[in-house]
Amino acid sequence: MANSFINKKADLTTTDLTTLYTVPSFKTAVVKSLIVSEDAGSGSTITITLVNSSGAIFNLFKDKAIASKATTELLTNPLVMEESEVLKVQAADANELHVIASILEIQPREVVS
């Protein structure tokens, strides 16, 4: 199977921790872009974490400010994620933030003997 570009989107309507993306079995993922936009006009903050396959939590962005009516690209370099790792997002305020991740999913090559 070929590699594929996908995107994952979330309208953060609550302040709950929300799963944005989970790397499928037998794949590696490269997050190429992570865009957050604020549409309420008051500004907000977002926390983004990566959870590895053992359940350890790594903060990528903690209370990152997103300006009023602004769109912010959070990544300056691609983020590599391994099988079963999870990208989670959490808004400080409900109904203010949208998140879009652009992702390349990589399928390992099959070895034929």
Roles of regions detected by a PLM:
Residues V36-G41, A92:
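Short solvent-exposed strand-capping/beta-turn motif centered on an Asx-Ser/Thr pair
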Residues P78-E96:
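Noncatalytic modules at the cell exterior or secretory-pathway interfaces
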Residues G41-D63:
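Short, surface-exposed beta-strand/strand-loop-strand elements in extracellular ectodomains
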Residues T71-P78:
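Exposed aromatic-hydrophobic patches
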Residues K64-T71:
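Short proline/glycine- and polar residue-rich coil/turn motifs
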Residues F26, K69, E83-S84:
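Tight coil/turn sites that cap or link beta-strands
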Residues M1-A29, S33, Q90-S113:
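C-terminal interaction-tip segments
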